Structures are given as structure tokens and as C-alpha cells.
UniProtKB/Swiss-Prot annotation:
Entry protein name: Ribosomal RNA small subunit methyltransferase A
GO cellular component terms, semicolon-separated: cytosol
Main function: Specifically dimethylates two adjacent adenosines (A1518 and A1519) in the loop of a conserved hairpin near the 3'-end of 16S rRNA in the 30S particle. May play a critical role in biogenesis of 30S subunits.
Signal sequence residues: none
Major site of localization recorded for this protein: cytoplasm
EC number: 2.1.1.182
SMART domains per record: rADc
Protein residues bound to S-adenosyl-L-methionine: 26, 28, 53, 74, 94, 114
Matches recorded under Pfam families: RrnaAD
Domain of life according to the entry: Bacteria
Gene symbol of the encoding locus: rsmA
A single MF term (Gene Ontology): 16S rRNA (adenine(1518)-N(6)/adenine(1519)-N(6))-dimethyltransferase activity
Protein location: Cytoplasm
Source species of the chain: Bdellovibrio bacteriovorus (strain ATCC 15356 / DSM 50701 / NCIMB 9529 / HD100)
Amino acid sequence: MSYSRERLQRAQEAMGIAAKKSLGQNFLVSDTVINRIIDQVKAFAPEELVEVGPGPGALTDLLLELNLPLQLIELDSAIAAYWREKGLTVIEQDALRLDWKQFYTGKRVVFVSNLPYQISSSIVIERSLENEGVAAMVLMFQKEVAQKIRGTVDSDLYGLLSVYAQAFWKIETVTDAGPRDFQPPPKVASRVLSFERIESEVKNRKAFLTFVKCAFAQRRKLLKKNLSGLLSQKKLTEEQMVGWLAELGFKETARAEELSPKQFVALYKHFGFE
């Protein structure tokens, strides 16, 4: 039995809990995967740490060894109580409804999590909406979601999540994790990604999100058709749009999946949302 499986067994006995399907709990038990996550966290040189969903502590115990301020966000009341008894600060709240500004004090904050799969895409969007926020993230995803986040131009997986995440982060694959690396085993493969904040020309990130959503609203439609509503809203013409596409090297028949994140930003800037 791996050290992580032994630790999970001890922690579950101490907490008197089992994984809750309703909360998307699949506890990580692979020493190899855990160590790769921790190594990536250390590579980002954090000054403070935030972990969502610590569970029985597969990552938490090793994060504590870094001797850095650590904030835990845990929705499961039994698990939250367990970590409070150990003297840690635990915010017992939904990570998607939390005001994350409380974590941003000018220090280099790194966010790490074996994310519940049902909130993973939303978490990435929420952190990407922030002009100032966490410096880096190391997060576990369902493999297909991870592939969408790192999706490339003209691929089936390239879409809203790809463009929006890549516009604000340098994203790399850290490691893969199979069903056997979790207890209970999920039905899907998983992948860990690292995110490092990059400079962006986009100031109004909410408007950019709306822009990209409209662009991918109907994949088979031409980009100029998907953005026709925004053109009207901004009192712009389709002819202007065709000209901007030409500047980027595209014909008027271009579709959203043909533009890179940088090209999306360049096109967006013509719409006057900033």
C-alpha cells in the first residue's frame, strides 16, 4: 500500500467519513502524482498558498511542509472541522461563491487543488476574470477538460475555454493521473495543469469573455455572423469586421476556431469595449 493510501485510511478513520459523490470527491492516493504537483507548486516560488478541497490531506500535508501561510477552502463540514482541529484556517464555503480578493494581499499566491470536476471549468474562468489575483495555479482536471483548456487552433477541442484561459495564462501539462490514482476511482482519466499569469492587453476581462462566448456561440457559423449582435451594439459594420479579419490574414469566411488567442485579443480591441 502506498504512503498516500495509508494516510487516506488513517485520515478517514479519524474523520469518520467516506468520499461524497454529491461533492465530487475522489481522493488522490498516488505518491507519484502528489509529488509532481508539489514540485510544480515549489517551482512557482509561492509566498502564500490557497487549496480548494483539501479532503483528508493528500496535498495539504505536503503543502504544510513548505512552511508558508496556507488557506483552505472546504465545503464538507466534517472535513473542515478536522482541519480546524489541527489549527488551520478553513473557509467553509463554495469556492465559486467566495470573495477571493481576501487572499490577495500583494504576496505571490499560488492556488492548488485536486478540483471537484463539476467546478473545474468555472474555477478557471473565475480566476481568469481577475485583473489581479493568484500568480499561478496547479490544478487537477478531467483529462478532456484539460485538453480543451490547452486546445489548439482548428482542433475539435478548441473553443471558449481554450481562448479565454490561454489569453491570460501560460499553461503546461504537469502529469496525467489514471482512475487507480484516486479513491474511489473515477470513471475518467485526469490531468494536472499548471497556470502562470501572463501580461495581457485586455483590461475589461468580462467584456472579453462575452466577446469570445459570442464568437463560439454556433461553431458552424461564420465569425462575422456570430459577432453580428455585438457589431450592431457597438454601431459597427460587417464591412469593418471583414477589414479587421483581413488585417489578421483571414478571409471573411473565417470561423472562430481559426483564430488564436492573440488574434482574438487583436480583433476584440477593435470593438471598443476597453
